[in-house]
Curated annotation (Swiss-Prot):
UniProt name for this protein: E3 ubiquitin-protein ligase SHPRH
Entry-linked SUPFAM superfamilies: FYVE/PHD zinc finger (SSF57903), P-loop containing nucleoside triphosphate hydrolases (SSF52540), RING/U-box (SSF57850), Winged helix' DNA-binding domain (SSF46785)
Biased amino acid composition, Basic residues: 568-588
Purpose of the protein: E3 ubiquitin-protein ligase involved in DNA repair. Upon genotoxic stress, accepts ubiquitin from the UBE2N-UBE2V2 E2 complex and transfers it to 'Lys-164' of PCNA which had been monoubiquitinated by UBE2A/B-RAD18, promoting the formation of non-canonical poly-ubiquitin chains linked through 'Lys-63'.
Gene of this entry: SHPRH
Length: 1683
């Protein structure tokens, strides 16, 4: 009973006390003003806009009401006088803002304003106006009456708005008036005036009426990005202006439902697409076409049918054929014209409330539309007829022709001969031997190298060497000392500075004294000197310097290097010149000098420079300068006579020379012709930009970026965009239907393959065909800024290569056609975005199924067509789709009828004369093995789908309304079941990948038996675990006899299932050991058995058997380690440990002064091709010279040998039988730690030694065990029972020490050191490999020893049973499983009893399935002749050739089964029977009937080789029957999954049937052509998603659908491949369905959906067809049938 005292009953409090207990939150703020935020977007929250509730202001606050704080933009409101008592009990009365509108007298000023309308203020009879009223400002305020207002007249000339302290200087008593506007509307006007969007002016008419003019100010005009601009949420200003305009001009939106925020758009229950198509057809029939043209073009081979002529005529009408588009600028659909009383024209949008001054032009007339003729009616021919009939006449040639007075600069380096010289002519030319080879001076080369290769860390000396060697072909090896001396001089002069390191091992950058002119100025000073002085300096330099400054002569490189000039006699040069005159006339030029990036020319130290007056080319010579000048001038004069000067001049000497090509090559002298952009003057390779030399005087050249930025080039070409699968089909159709040479056709493959095609080249074509894949990829090449433009990236140096933009946007296409246009119906996909960016006159969407999920899909096509305003999503939804959803389809239907043409097969069937199409359904039955597999999958999938569907509350939702991830998740079980109906191996994740081999049914049966056996062992393990646990509970409770009986039950169960199952040996050991302990204790009540004496021996055998595996592993690991250790001893004997070979090599390198090369080689080997570990200092950064390398290697080798010795000793100490101390320490340390491993036992210590040794021997990328557990502690991950690492934690990469040794050995070999050094080094490398092998085997040996100790601990744990914690024993933390609290005993007993019941039931079920599969295997045994000798358990007769198998595995003859079914069926619908042996329930549909006799039906007796699934075998048999009945007939096989097609292809190969398969894009066209043309290939395997769109395969007459297709439009597309115009034979559709599976349910559901949608041709996907309830129904009904 509760200890609380009884309380008194509640008593009603009197009124006075209630008043005392009441608290008013506004009491303390009675006279305090409330600051209400004045947001420009939203009205004041909580305010009531009706005029009936205004707050009367107190006199002290009247002046503050109208005050507007410009900084805070707030409204000041106060509460009225104290609230009455009865009001305090109720809800606080609503607030409202005081009406306060200032109306000024009208005066003329220069500001723009437009008169919108006026409102009338009528004075009451007793009121009158004062004198000069029209010259005064008035304030309109609300009164106590909701229908009347007060006006206050201000002093004359008083500016009420500009006064801040006293804005309402009331000069007289308020005048009562009535307004033509409501109080709410007046409030809106006040808000608009306060925001300075409108202005109110008063104009009295008589003594009793005041007219108030509403004027729109310039700030009230809308600023729109485009005319159809519509924000998803209207601003407050627009909302109020809309109300005002409706009041003034009655501008209510015509015939359109207003937006209802509370009622969002909802998809209609059923969208009848046929109703839309019927409306379109009726509309076109009622129209009279203004154009009737004979569209049968002479170049068109096929004769157009009447419906095709009508379609082409309609398309011509849409393109305004023989009539120009309307030139009058029509008013935009969304806007209305308003003319003010002053004659000013404004334009108002009644949908958004926006007003503008500019005329809203509706834009160009729509040219194009949607051609939606049904599949197979010849849309391709109709488009070709349109292209041939209507060509563009007004092509502007300005962009395609070269402007007057301009010449394209086209330059070819001189070594490139336009025409080849004959061999005899070359022999006649006598060349003198080269006298001298020149190159830039060393200081120029070094400064150029430092400048060009400068980075964040500077330039190393090696980088300078590489640059000088590769660019100038300078002999660095020979002249290294000269380069070093020059570098020291440059550092001393301040032109170069060292930023890192010491000596030449550091890095360098340009110094503070360096200037851009240094390179050329220095060389010019040297070049200006007289030849005599130069020769003198050359002689002084000596032979060594001369050899270092000049490269060795090599005739093979002479012509390739522009820096070396060879000087010949005038006679020989003149002979060569005569041969080269023709090529010079074509625009070729003389040798030139390669400028640097700044346009300067590198000069030579021993040459004079002479500028030729007639050109900018430079002729360089060491002697005879005058003669050379004459030769150069003479040569250029010849060129000038025929070619414009810009073509012959070398561009490299000009200051504005820039070269940047799309090929990415650097600006080096090559033999490729170059061309210059007329706009940005950029030079590029002519071939790279597809500019032909023959167009020099005809076509202008602009670089790709300039072309894209210019106005598009107008052309008469038609761009056709098609799927990849039918791209080549377009070419075939054009070749077949159009006479040769009538059309020029180009298949464009994108800038990746074709490069940048010149727009004038595209403009010369009649048809350009691209694929959607190319179109999608071209989007990446549209908005690429010019690298040197303002939008491009600003780089320190010029970019190496130019990114290529897409040329498609540089052309104004005459016509753009989207074939299979449903691919762009989603306007967010890349292909749709690119299609919208293309510039075109006529736009066409071509699709037999323009509607996929619903009518909202048409929006993507409307966006491509660019039809305003419906190409904006807001207007599409508001004006068309929302009314359609609300049962008002007229607007949408009328709009679509204007842009869409549709001809259906049923309407023109008499014109096309296509033979009929029939359908044949093949109902199949699973084999027993497949049925068992399917039932397993169904059980798992049902559980999965129930769990997922529970998360969805509303099952009436369509799957299309859910997000994609959820839909994929809940459809996945359905997908698995559908795949299981085709082939077990098609189910993902069930078996090995198909690449290995296709599984036969025998292999499937074997796999199922193994799985079932594993499941039986798992169920038996759970049962034994429960029995052992219950025995422990009985021992705790003192019930020893029951415990012994349970242990004996475990041993009996183990013996009973000995032949079928494998019992866990540790569980048997647990039962044997504890039973033996009970018997030794001699507890009363335990009966003896004959087996009691053998328990000790059995326990010993179990222990020995368990330990034998571990002992064997230890012995094998030790045996594998021994030969490797022997090899190591042999290698070590060959190496001199006192004087290592690498030490001798280092000493020799120092002795020969090649130590720097050795150091650099070692560093390169360490740093190259290996990723450095982050946060770790590399070995290459620890030494600078050979002395440091020597010390580092010595230290590391000593540490390596030390770690190696420690690891070997640690492993050696672990050998032998483990002692009790070792086992106990390992148990406490890591086998059974309290929380985290302690790493204190000998095994863990050895593991740390292994980690250390591994970091020395291999690349240090491993992580030790301690570090791993430290991270776990930091992350607070808790227990880590199974997280102890067992092997290495990183990659076994080559260590830096070994790589250094390899580099030293390579250095010794290259410099041919002593052979004994090299041999010893090779032996040392072999020793490293042996050490690594030893490490791996040593670690495996350590693991085997560790596992042996772990096995000993496992045996000790296996004998422990449940026990109660002793009161004196501390509570374990974390809890230990076998130690329980006293109060948990009964709880654990109940849990174990439940586990026992579940495990017993599961074991019985799985054993039945295993027996069932075993009997199935017997039925497939052909050695017995198909006769089962076993007797029937009921009638004892031989089963023979026909019997029945239940799911429990027991077999009965057919007669006994029929009696049991008729007389002894059980269940709610009497649909199940119980086995006569085990009493397990089996559904009637789950009974398998085995027939081993030959089939009597000869028609089905077509042998199919191989063991395949039921469906695959049926498909192959059907294909074989087709060939038997109609040899040569071709068939298409469609499947949703590529894996299923691969399985079918394997079956066809086994049966020697020729076929073609389309699986990859690359072989698509090749395989398709082979199927069409090769009479031996009569089968084509097609995936549904790629092979069902747009293909024309009328060669085939049979279509095989392997599985039911949830998307009816995909099915229509697949069938439409053969049933189309041009087909001359009857076609047959074959469907393959499995009885009593998900396929039967799906077929029934799809038929019902088809009838309910009135055969709608809408394209429904799985998500749009199914609801959540439908999906649940698919599984639940089938489950009921199975049960």
């Amino acid at each position: 009973m509760s200890s609380r005292r009884k309380r008194a009953p509640p008593v009603r409090v009197d009124e006075e006390k209630r008043q005392q207990l009441h608290w008013n939150m506004h009491e303390d703020r009675r006279n305090e003003p409330i600051i209400i935020s004045d947001d420009d977007e939203q009205p004041c929250p909580g305010s009531d806009t009706s005029s009936a509730h205004y707050i009367i202001l107190s006199d002290s606050l009247k002046e503050e009401v109208a005050h507007r704080d410009k900084k805070r933009c707030s409204k000041v409101v106060s509460f009225s006088k104290p609230i009455e008592k009865e009001e305090t009990v109720g809800i606080f009365s609503p607030l409202s803002v005081k009406l306060n509108i200032v109306i000024s007298p009208y005066h003329f000023d220069n500001s723009w304003k437009a008169f919108l309308g006026e409102l009338t203020l009528q004075l009451l009879p007793a009121q009158s106006l004062i004198e000069n009223f029209s010259e005064r400002s008035i304030t309109l305020m609300s009164s106590e009456s909701s229908n009347q207002f007060l006006i206050y007249v201000h002093s004359k000339g008083e500016d009420v708005e500009k006064q801040k302290k006293e804005p309402m200087s009331i000069c007289d008593k308020g005048i009562l008036v009535e307004s033509s506007f409501s109080g709410e509307m007046l409030e809106d006007l006040g808000w608009l005036q306060k925001k300075r969007r409108i202005k109110l002016y008063q104009k009295p008419e008589g003594n009793h009426i005041i007219k108030v003019g509403i004027y729109l100010l310039e700030a009230g005009l809308a600023k729109l990005d485009f005319l159809s601009d519509a924000n998803s949420r209207m601003k407050k200003f627009n909302q109020l202006m809309k109300k005002v305009m409706e009041k003034l001009h009655n501008s209510i939106i015509p015939d359109v439902l207003e937006e209802d925020e509370d009622d969002p758009e909802s998809e209609p229950e059923g969208q009848d697409i046929d109703e839309l198509y019927h409306f379109v057809k009726q509309t076109h029939q009622q129209e009279t076409q203004s154009i009737q043209v004979d569209v049968q073009h002479p170049a068109l081979i096929p004769v157009l049918r009447p419906y095709q002529r009508e379609a082409v005529n309609w398309m011509l009408q849409q393109e305004c054929f023989r009539s120009s588009p309307a030139t009058e600028s029509a008013l935009h659909f969304l806007w209305r014209e308003i003319v003010t009383s002053e004659g000013l024209k404004l334009y108002y949008n009644p949908y958004t409330g926006c007003i503008i001054r500019e005329y809203p032009n509706s834009g160009p007339q729509l040219l194009g539309g949607i051609l939606a003729d049904e599949m197979g009616l010849g849309k391709t021919v109709e488009v070709l007829a349109l292209i041939l009939t209507h060509t563009r006449q007004d092509v502007k040639q300005d962009a395609l022709t070269l402007p007057e007075g301009k010449v394209v600069n086209y330059f070819i380096p001189s070594h490139y001969f336009g025409g080849k010289l004959k061999k005899t002519e070359i022999q006649n030319i006598e060349f003198e031997p080269k006298e001298k080879v020149q190159c830039p001076p060393t200081r120029v080369m070094i400064l150029t190298a430092v400048k060009e290769m400068n980075g964040k860390k500077g330039v190393s000396i090696l980088s300078i060497y590489k640059y000088v060697s590769s660019i100038y072909r300078y002999d660095v090896q020979r002249n290294r000392s000269l380069l070093k001396r020059m570098l020291k001089c440059l550092i001393f002069e301040g032109l170069v500075k060292q930023i890192k390191g010491h000596g030449f091992s550091g890095t360098f950058t340009l110094g503070k004294n360096y200037k851009e002119e240094d390179i050329c100025d220095k060389t010019k000073k040297q070049a200006v000197g007289s030849p005599r002085k130069i020769q003198k300096e050359t002689r002084k330099s000596g032979n060594k310097d001369t050899d270092s400054e000049y490269l060795p002569s090599d005739t093979s490189d002479d012509d390739d290097d522009p820096y070396y000039y060879y000087y010949k006699s005038r006679r020989n040069r003149s002979k060569l010149r005569k041969k080269l005159v023709p090529s010079t006339k074509k625009g070729k030029s003389q040798p030139f000098i390669n400028p640097d990036s700044q346009g300067h020319c590198p000069a030579t130290s021993d040459s004079g420079i002479t500028d030729v007056a007639m050109s900018k080319s430079t002729c360089i010579s060491e002697f005879n300068q005058e003669h050379e000048t004459e030769d150069c001038a003479e040569s250029l004069n010849h060129a000038d006579s025929d070619v414009p000067p810009s073509n012959t001049m070398s561009p490299f000497n000009t200051s504005d020379y820039r070269f940047e090509c799309i090929c990415g090559e650097l600006d080096q002298i090559d033999r490729k012709p170059r061309v210059q952009c007329l706009k940005c003057h950029l030079w590029q390779h002519a071939k790279c930009v597809n500019y032909d030399e023959k167009n020099l005087k005809i076509k202008p050249f602009y670089c790709p970026h300039c072309l894209v930025a210019m106005e598009p080039v107008s052309t008469r070409a038609t761009l056709i965009i098609s799927p990849s699968s039918i791209c080549h089909q377009w070419v075939d159709e054009i070749n077949r239907h159009v006479r040769s040479s009538s059309l020029r056709v180009l298949v464009y493959q994108g800038v990746k393959k074709d490069g940048f095609l010149q727009p004038h080249f595209l403009a010369e074509q009649d048809i350009v065909i691209i694929t959607y894949d190319v179109l999608r990829s071209e989007l990446n090449y549209v908005d690429i800024p010019h690298s040197n433009s303002e939008d491009g990236r600003r780089l320190r140096n010029q970019k190496r290569y130019m990114a290529i933009p897409s040329p498609l946007v540089a052309v104004e296409w005459w016509r753009i056609c989207l074939d299979e246009a449903q691919m762009v119906e989603c306007p967010t996909v890349k292909a749709a975005e690119m299609a919208q960016r293309l510039s075109g006159i006529n736009r066409w969407c071509i699709s037999g199924t323009p509607v996929q999920r619903g009518l909202e899909d048409l929006f993507g096509l409307v966006v491509f067509l660019g039809i305003e305003p419906y190409c904006v999503k807001h207007w599409w939804v508001r004006l068309l789709y929302r009314p359609y959803c609300k049962k008002n389809p007229q607007h949408l239907y009328s709009f679509i009828a204007k842009i869409l043409w549709r001809s259906a097969k049923k309407d023109v069937i008499d014109q096309i004369q296509i033979p009929p199409q029939t359908e044949e359904i093949h109902w199949l039955h699973f084999s027993p093995v497949e049925r068992h597999f399917y039932h397993r999958q169904h059980e798992v999938c049902c559980q999965d789908v129930v769990v997922k569907l529970r998360k969805i509350s509303d099952w009436a939702l369509k799957l299309s309304s859910l997000d994609r991830r959820t839909v994929t998740s809940i459809l996945y079980p359905l997908l698995r079941l559908r795949q299981a109906c085709c082939h077990p191996q098609a189910v993902r994740g069930e078996f090995l990948p198909l690449q290995k081999s296709t599984m036969t049914m025998e292999e499937l049966l074997t796999s199922l038996q193994k799985k079932c056996g594993t499941e039986c062992e798992e169920a038996h393990r759970q049962l034994v675990c429960a029995l052992n646990g219950l025995a422990g509970i009985h021992i705790i409770k003192g019930e020893y006899a029951l415990a012994a009986e349970l242990y004996r039950e475990v041993l009996r169960s183990s013996e009973e299932h000995k032949g079928k199952l494998k019992t866990d040996s540790l569980q048997r050991l647990h039962a044997t050991h504890n039973l033996m302990e009970l018997l030794i204790a001699r507890h009363p009540g335990i009966p003896p058995t004959l087996r009691d004496g053998r328990l000790e021996e059995e326990a010993k055998q179990l222990r020995e058997h368990y330990m034998s595996k571990c002992n064997t592993e230890v012995a094998e690991a030790q045996q594998a380690l021994y030969p490797v250790q022997q090899t190591i001893h042999e290698l070590q004997r060959k190496i001199h440990s006192n004087s290592p070979w690498w030490l001798n090599v280092i000493h020799r390198a120092i002795e020969f002064t090649i130590d720097e090369e050795l150091v650099q080689r070692v560093r390169n080997e360490i740093t190259s091709n290996y990723k450095q570990q982050t946060g770790k200092l590399s070995m290459s950064e620890k030494f600078r010279d050979c002395r440091g390398l020597q010390f580092l290697l010595t230290t590391q080798m000593e540490e390596l040998n030390k770690c190696q010795k420690l690891v070997r000793e640690a492993v050696k100490n672990l050998e032998g039988p483990p002692s009790r101390n070792v086992i106990e320490s390992a148990t406490v340390c890591h086998l059974r730690p309290a929380r985290l491993p302690l790493n204190c036992c000998v095994f863990c210590k050895a593991d740390e030694l292994f980690t250390e040794y591994e970091s020395k021997l291999f690349s240090n990328t491993v992580k030790g065990q301690t570090a791993i557990f430290e991270e776990m502690i930091e992350d607070e991950e808790g227990l880590v029972d199974d997280r102890a690492p067992t092997t290495t934690r990183g990659l076994w990469a080559i260590s830096e020490t070994e790589r250094s040794m390899k580099a030293i050995l390579s250095f010794a070999k290259s410099h041919r050191f002593d052979v004994e050094f090299v041999d010893e080094g090779s032996t040392s490398m072999d020793l490293f490999e042996a050490w690594k092998k030893e490490y791996k085997l040593l670690h495996e040996y350590w693991m085997a020893l560790r596992n042996r100790v772990s096995a000993v601990d496992e045996l000790a744990m296996a004998t422990e049973r449940l026990r109660v914690r002793d009161p004196r024993e501390p509570k374990p933390n974390p809890p230990v499983l076998h130690i329980i609290e006293p109060h948990e005993v009964e709880q654990n007993r109940i849990k174990l009893l439940n586990d026992k019941a579940v495990a017993t039931s599961q074991l019985q079920k799985k054993l039945g399935q295993l027996l069932y599969l075993t009997n199935l295997e017997k039925s497939q045994d052909k050695t017995s002749g198909g006769v089962n000798p076993e007797p029937c358990p009921i009638c004892a007769r031989q089963l023979g050739k026909q019997w029945a198998v239940l799911t429990c595995g027991h077999c009965f003859c057919n007669e006994c089964i029929s009696i049991i079914i008729e007389q002894y069926s059980v269940g709610s619908h009497r649909s199940s029977i119980k086995c006569a042996i085990c009493r397990q329930t089996t559904s009637h549909k789950e009974i398998s009937y085995v027939f081993t006799s030959e089939k009597a039906n000869q028609e089905e007796d077509i042998p199919v080789k191989g063991s395949h699934s039921t469906k695959v075998e049926a498909v192959v048999r059907t294909l074989m029957k087709i060939q038997l009945r109609d040899p040569g007939a071709k068939a298409l096989v469609f499947s949703t999954w590529q894996d299923v097609l691969d399985i079918i292809s394997k079956a066809l190969t086994d049966n020697n049937m020729e076929f073609a398969q389309i699986s990859r894009v690359k072989t698509f066209q090749e395989n398709l052509s082979a199927f069409k043309r090769d009479p031996q290939i009569n089968i084509l395997l097609l995936p549904l998603h790629t092979g069902s769109n747009g293909l024309t395969i009328i060669e085939a007459t049979h279509v095989l659908l392997v599985e039911p297709i949830l998307n009816p439009a995909h099915e229509l597309q697949a069938i439409g491949r053969v049933h189309r115009i041009g087909q001359t034979k009857p076609t047959i559709v074959h469907r393959f369905l499995i009885k009593a599976t998900i396929e039967e349910r799906m077929q029934a559901m799809l038929k019902t959906a088809e009838r309910s949608h009135t055969n709608s041709s809408a394209k429904h996907s799985e998500a749009s067809v199914l609801t959540v309830a439908d999906l649940a129904d698919l599984f639940t009904k089938e489950t009921e049938e199975l049960e």
